Amino acid sequence: MSDALKKSIVDAIEEGQLKLGYREETIRLYYPLSSLCTLMHQSMDAAQMTRALTTFSEQVKGELGEIEVSRKGERFCLAVGPKGAAWVHEHTDPSGFLADFIAAIGRHGCTMDELLAIFRRHGGHVHVEALHNGEFDWLVYFEDGRPDAYYYCIADEGCRLTYHRFTKEDYEAFGFETT
């Protein structure tokens, strides 16, 4: 079983539940083949990945319930059923870093200083880097991967801050320029 893929699925569902609230419903997550290969720690073509994901879904069925796998070309959809949504809701921390981060960035008038204070409150080694790539203004992440290993790309949209979070590997694959 791919622990990295399971973590990615759980983290994405948790993020959605923190933003939109919990509902016991099917959640569809979309992944490009390249990201799945990184998460599965091996190179595969689309047909091989489909088989690997079918095996993976059987392995995590006890926790995440049924996961329906479909694809169009090299774009995969993992449809996690209501049982999986409920399991994530019951097994994630509603008061951790991600909850604090999402609550702050979702508030009108949130500043970068507020976000950095949240990062520093939850972890001791915070990397902050100004970006000049036309997409994002800052890259922030926990250097030691605790409490999470995602790369947070934050943009100042003038009236509010927005973000996208990436695995280190996906961030590097995008080739964003840094200062």
What feature does the model see in each segment?
Residues 23-43, 98-104:
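Short glycine-rich, basic-tinged beta-strand/loop micro-motifs
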Residues 117-151:
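A cross-family detector of function-defining hotspots
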Residues 97-129, 167, 175:
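Negatively charged, low-complexity tracts enriched in Asp/Glu with abundant Ser/Thr
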Residues 146-177:
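Intrinsically disordered, low-complexity regulatory segments enriched in Ser/Thr/Pro
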Residues 58-94, 143:
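Charged low-complexity interaction tracts in eukaryotic proteins
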Residues 1-29:
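Positively charged, polyanion-binding regions of nucleic-acid-associated proteins
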Residues 88-99, 127, 134:
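Long, charge-rich, low-complexity intrinsically disordered regions
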Residues 27, 37-66:
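Charge-enriched amphipathic alpha-helical scaffolds
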